[in-house]
């Protein structure tokens, strides 16, 4: 089924220019939304808790900052861009008591709405505007007169104005310059979680670590294994990002292409596909979200344990040593401090 696409001519910027927008959070997406909306002539304020390290940064960039409760009371459009696991408590404590008839509650990701962790009053418009790129790219493209494709969705529309408002907001951050796709909270949430877990984060990470283990256990130097299964991954992903799988196969050697065709299906086979379906089923049923919430309620103990085990994998030790040789690689603070 073809998706609905919208561009600049389909969106009326004056709609969002006539509203007061509170952006909750000032991370990657929060700063991009706020600055771009401001530059589009929108009245914007940032909601950050007292003591947040981001307060000074936002103020230095000329933005008005208040607590989430203060800016929610002032605004009639509230964009929630805080971390998923913090959104429900922020909504309950700071946003919900200040909601008024005619307000709109927007999100950059649908998890909390789709899985009923947040239930907005019936008189509030509930929507989503989600650029398909990191905040620094959203902001850079906007400044350059371009845009990053975005998704919009409407979950609750008491006044029948939700889509026009979402498109106007998307135009304010440059999304309609590239193209905006209409979706649903269900589709965005479930596809996003599946991509992260089965392919982008979980699947890729385990593939890399297992490949490293196989090579080291076979007697190859850890440094050689690291280069072959992790370091060179960026070269392949960049080619796929720029032109798809066909571009990647065109660009690599015939030896690599032929070997990939033969061996790829031996690694990712029908059994793997069935396990991926099971992951999707856990997402669709809400099982993953229940476990995510339980982890937060238990003080992040499960997540911290998984992080610790991951950090102790031999590939991390080898990688840090090799990255010391790479002057062109931007080093994370944890490795340079």
Curated annotation (Swiss-Prot):
It catalyses: (2R)-2,3-dihydroxy-3-methylbutanoate + NADP(+) = (2S)-2-acetolactate + NADPH + H(+); (2R,3R)-2,3-dihydroxy-3-methylpentanoate + NADP(+) = (S)-2-ethyl-2-hydroxy-3-oxobutanoate + NADPH + H(+). The keyword Magnesium applies. It is an enzyme of class 1 (oxidoreductase). Substrate binds at residue 253. Residues 184-329 form the KARI C-terminal knotted domain. Its EC number is 1.1.1.86. GO terms for biological process: isoleucine biosynthetic process; L-valine biosynthetic process. One of its GO terms (cellular component) is cytosol. Keywords: Amino-acid biosynthesis, Branched-chain amino acid biosynthesis, Magnesium, Metal-binding, NADP, Oxidoreductase. Mg(2+) 1 binds at residues 192, 196. Pathway: Amino-acid biosynthesis; L-isoleucine biosynthesis; L-isoleucine from 2-oxobutanoate: step 2/4; Amino-acid biosynthesis; L-valine biosynthesis; L-valine from pyruvate: step 2/4. One of its GO terms (molecular function) is magnesium ion binding. Its cofactor is Mg(2+). Binds 2 magnesium ions per subunit. Residues 3-183 form the KARI N-terminal Rossmann domain. The active site is at 109. Pfam families: KARI_C, KARI_N. Mg(2+) 2 binds at residues 192, 228, 232. NADP(+) binds at residues 26-29, 49, 52, 54, 84-87, 135. Belongs to the ketol-acid reductoisomerase family. Involved in the biosynthesis of branched-chain amino acids (BCAA). Catalyzes an alkyl-migration followed by a ketol-acid reduction of (S)-2-acetolactate (S2AL) to yield (R)-2,3-dihydroxy-isovalerate. In the isomerase reaction, S2AL is rearranged via a Mg-dependent methyl migration to produce 3-hydroxy-3-methyl-2-ketobutyrate (HMKB). In the reductase reaction, this 2-ketoacid undergoes a metal-dependent reduction by NADPH to yield (R)-2,3-dihydroxy-isovalerate. This is Ketol-acid reductoisomerase (NADP(+)). It comes from Rhodococcus erythropolis (strain PR4 / NBRC 100887). The lineage of its organism: Bacteria, Bacillati, Actinomycetota, Actinomycetes, Mycobacteriales.
